[in-house]
From Swiss-Prot:
Gene3D superfamilies: 3.40.630.30. One of its GO terms (cellular component) is nucleus. This is UPF0039 protein C11D3.02c. Residues 9-150 form the N-acetyltransferase domain. GO terms for molecular function: acyltransferase activity, transferring groups other than amino-acyl groups.
Length: 150
């Protein structure tokens, strides 16, 4: 797991290959793997930060987007790890970096929120998030809201 590189960019700074890699990974997981026939690309992509984790070969292995919301709150969304790269700890590394990058980019950030698929809660709990809602359906998949207060 050495030679990993985090890259953080806003939409207008992404090159064509980075954008392709992001949309390919998200579509392969959120649409194809999870059989979720809902649009994957949305207007949020235009105004959020894109956090990418690449391996030594330059392959995009994990991704999340960082969305500043109301005062002092950042939403972490579209957290995804390449199916072939799971069980390598990339999800946890990504989340720790997402928190660190959010603190740097949005210095007043004190609260972090996300919408977790039910099965992914242990990952988010491992970095300090706590469940703060009952289960609800998002695109037909059970989710819960989770929050981390600094």
């Amino acid at each position: 797991m050495s030679n990993l590189e985090f890259v953080y960019k806003y939409f207008n700074s992404l090159d064509v290959k980075e954008l392709y890699d992001i949309y390919l990974l998200r579509t392969n997981v959120f649409v194809v793997e999870q059989k979720c026939a809902y649009p994957e690309v949305d207007e949020i992509d235009l105004k959020c930060g894109h956090l990418m984790l690449r391996n030594a070969n330059g392959k995009l292995v994990a991704y999340a987007r960082l969305i500043p919301e109301q005062q002092q709150t950042v939403r972490i969304g579209r957290v995804v790890v390449d199916p072939d790269e799971r069980k390598n700890g990339y999800g946890r590394k990504l989340m720790l970096q997402a928190l660190e990058t959010s603190k740097q980019e949005f210095s007043s950030s004190k609260t972090f929120v996300l919408s977790s698929q039910e099965y992914a809660q242990p990952l988010y709990r491992s970095v300090g998030f706590k469940k703060c809602s009952d289960a609800y359906l998002e695109d037909g998949i059970p989710h819960v809201e989770m929050r981390l207060e600094l």
